[in-house]
Amino acid sequence: MSSIAQSIRVKVLFFGRLKEVAGGAEEFVELAPGSRIEELFACFVARQPELARYRRSLVASRNQEFAAWSTPLHPGDEIAFLPPVSGG
């Protein structure tokens, strides 16, 4: 048995103002198995603390379906963080 921890790789997408704050629209991230969307977002907040101010108004999606922040991640998932939409 290997002592090296396994990881999962997910694709992360940012939209709207979040692209600027996060430093890009798309990124691949390696996480520990069992990680949840909220933990993924926390990784980005650790790098870009300004993202924390958007957390309460964001919606997350997993594989193009709305998802709760407590949703577990799986290898190959595509996670998108979407700011509120406004329009006229």
Residue ranges and their predicted role:
Residues 1-87:
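Ubiquitin-like/PB1-type beta-grasp interaction modules and other compact soluble beta-rich domains
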